[in-house]
Amino acid sequence: MSKVRINDLARELEVKSKAILDALADCGVTEKKTHSSSLEADEAVRVRAHFARGSRGAGQGGSRQQNEPKPKIDWSRVSKPGDVLKAIQERNEQETVAAARPAAVPVAPKAPVSAPPAARPSAPRPAVTAAPPPVAARPAGVQPGSQPAVSVQHGAEAQKPAPRRIVPQPRQPSAVVAPPPAATPAIAARPPAAPVAVKPPVTTAPIAQQEKPAAPAAQEVKSALATGPSVPVAVSPSVVVAAAPPPATAFQAPAAPAAPAASQSAPQEAKTPAAEAPPVAPEKPAVPAPPQRRVIMPQTGPRPVYTAPPPSASPVTPRPSGGGIQRGKPIFDRRPTGNSPGGPGGPGGGYGQRPSGPGGRRPMHPTRNQPGGGPPGGRPGFNNGPRPGFGQRPGGFGQRPGMGAPGLVPPPGDTPGRPQRPGAGQKRGGRSNQYPKSKEGPMKGFAPPSRFGGAQIPTEPLPITRTITVTEGISVKDLAEKLGVRGKDLIATLLMRGVFVTVNQSLDGELVKDVARQFGADTTVISFEDQMANEAFENLLSQENPDELELSRPPVVTVMGHVDHGKTSLLDAIRETDVAGGEAGGITQHIGAYKVRINKEDSPAFGREIVFLDTPGHEAFTRMRARGAKVTDIVVIVVAADDGVMPQTLEAVDHAKAANVPIIVAVNKIDKPEAQPDRVKKQLGDRGLVPEDWGGSTVFVDVSAKKRQNLDLLLEMICLVADLGNLKATPGRSAVGTVIEAKLDRGRGAVASVLVQNGTLRAQDSFIVGNTFGKIRAMFDDRGRAIEEAGPSTPVEILGLENMPDAGDTFLVVADRDKAKGIAQYRQMKEREVQLAKSSRVSLEGLAEQIKQAGMKELPLILKGDVTGSVEVLADSLQKMSTEKVRIKVIHSGVGAITESDVLLASASNAIIIGFNVKPDRKSADLAEQENVEIRLHTIIYELQEEITKAMLGLLDPVFKESYLGRAEVLNVFKIPKIGTIAGCRVLDGVLRRDSEIRLMRGGEQVFKGKLTSLKRFKDDAKEVTNGMECGVGLNTSDIQVGDTVEAFTMERVAAELTAQ
């Protein structure tokens, strides 16, 4: 026996597989089954019967409001919405006429009426005869929900009365009486039929129900007018009379065995030929239609199922009719029969049994002219014209499985104007374009993902509505968090731009700006150093306590100026003033900052302190400003009165203005006879620094460092400008400062000079500075004395660093060492990301630059210095010396003596070690001699630059220049055995030399290039032949012709140049 899978049976019964598994025990199946198990044929029959009983029981009892079906509309008879309104108006007019007529005399019916069979064959319904009019009310004892549908047959005559149907409508309170039906119309080939005559209505007698079998879920009724579409009418549950004439070729499916007469009359009526009379339009009565109750069109109902009349020879047992969808019942069994509601040709009906012999037309799409198979013919029960009504119900159905022949299924998009109800993207019958089958088991509800993973990718740039701040080398994940989008959306956007990245990959600044603009955000890219400075200041602000006392602090002054303008002399003079005031003199300054105390009693600034920074010029000041650390409070610009304003002076002024720092101009060397202080004031006034005595706001002080003139006035003016700035600090908070200089001491390790800007720094404090951390083991002031704490504006030298910090890094005291270590590790990771971002992505421009640099010479260097400031300045200045032909590459730079590791690195990379104010130890020098590593030691930067320039020139290839000598014309060609071809020439200009190179030209093209093998004047060898003389020239070629030109030249080596010409 054939088996049926539980999944297939569940789809057939339109239930879940779990429901079938739960019902197996009730059906006598004790073996354990799963969703993919199979059932025997007899077991499947029992399961179908079980669900059929359950659906009928649910339809009659229980939740009546939920399971009771709604009345249906025969969509096959509605072509447009106007037909519905027309049918309603005609129906109302007919009802009005019927209500005005007198009651007709009841007559006996002409033919027995077959009632629809019950679900079980053992309990058939008896045949019911229809009583003649007038209209009779329904007995109160009969419930509408259990009243069966009854159809009336009167014969096959052309003028037979229309059948009567009892329409159950349980939820309508008012009673409606239908007008008398029209006679059976004659049917033409295609157009719909029209009524010919009208007969009095027929009243159906109440039916005595002997047994109450399990009826279908609901009885749905549709009335089909001969002149229009079928319209549902609100009726009363007690008195309802509906009239609907069947078509001329009406037929009836065979009734139950209890009514054999009715089953035999159906095929006879089906064979009645259609009359050839043209369709007649019905007359519309002049009686106005009274207002009727609003008609509600239901949107649910079964799919229309078409059938053909069964052959008369072998009647088929009819199946129970049912217009509504019965859940749990197989979808293939919904083929109502009989000329009753739900039967073929009737209102709301579908297909009957398909005929076994040749007959009616096979089902076809409404837009097709001919079906795919079967001979053309009239389809019983349907018009051959265009299908009236509303067309397909919203969300329509696909082709019925197993129905039709090849060519019956319309192609996709062939049916115009088929609306879809929400959520009905799937068609029945397996005809669907997108995932027609519902999956069971673990793959239930699965649908393939959309393109780009469902990413919402903006196709056009959004308007700029916000601003974000990112660091260099930000990862894709961090950028997505700042933009508020998903990481895969950002990756998809980059993919559309041709950039392939992962979620952890770093991005460069320009790409970040472009992508953020696509998502409606303006981007500010800051460096890693700026981020660390911002974090430090945020921590500073977060730790501020309004209850803490703010005190005035000493100003921090930076002295800047052009070379040889007396900057160093002025600082020495100020220091001498401090020493003359009683301080110990001759103190060697180990750090670049020191304090000066004003001890002149008659001075207004007596007892005040000023901190001077001895920084390496404007270069270090620019770096501090770029890192966001405003170390300097006041800038003193030193200008020589005899020399005037120089370019470096203007550059220092620009840096001070960019840092928004007050400027004091010290006009030095006023003791010289050629001094012109007014010229200096005019030059600086043109740059925006207008003196106070000229109506400006810039303080000008005329000083002489050599004679120590007006130095006290300069210090007093510095204190006055500081008071205007209201410089305050909070000594009670944790210390915050800036690294001025850092160096590596052999005995003490890493040493940093720090200027405390706020708070108080104490010994044993844990701190974070840049990307390193540490704990203060010892602290010294500017005079080398060990101290325990340092207040605001105090320069100190600290020990206890784990690594070397950079000049300008922010110094911040934290709670404990572990926290400082975590912050340092995080900053080191971010710094690595920045470096990777600069080197990982290779664009087309970068690739072209690499190809261009492939032919460049490279000079690798290892740079070691005494302090970090010197190393930074040297590294920048040396790299700026790179040209298009030679590029300087600093492999490693550091602070301290030259070590063995430096020598090994230089040996591996063929680099030169440059030592600035440092020397190698004995082991390092021996290793360098063994490895043939060159070490160059310097103390002056200018000498270092000159030596590097010579090394760069030595790397260039030798350059040769062609020098023209003379030209001769070939007059004759001689071929001498054992010697070769000799050209007899006359020198046209210049000279031909025996050691020169020649070029043989013919017609402006070079034929041969080489050296002269011989040069003779007649029979004698000659060293050279001058202009106008004839000679014999021997060449290492035989391709010589009369009229060729011999050009003589030499190649000279010239000095190479670093820049391209």
Curated annotation (Swiss-Prot):
Q: What are the annotated GO cellular component locations?
A: cytosol
Q: Name one GO molecular function term.
A: GTP binding
Please list where the region (G3) is annotated: 614-617
Q: Which UniProt keywords apply?
A: Cytoplasm, GTP-binding, Initiation factor, Nucleotide-binding, Protein biosynthesis
Q: By its UniProt entry, which PROSITE patterns does this protein fall under?
A: G_TR_2 (PS51722), IF2 (PS01176)
Q: Where is the composition biased (Basic and acidic residues)?
A: 67-77
State the name under which the record lists this protein. Translation initiation factor IF-2
Source organism of the structure: Acidobacterium capsulatum (strain ATCC 51196 / DSM 11244 / BCRC 80197 / JCM 7670 / NBRC 15755 / NCIMB 13165 / 161)
| Record gene name | infB
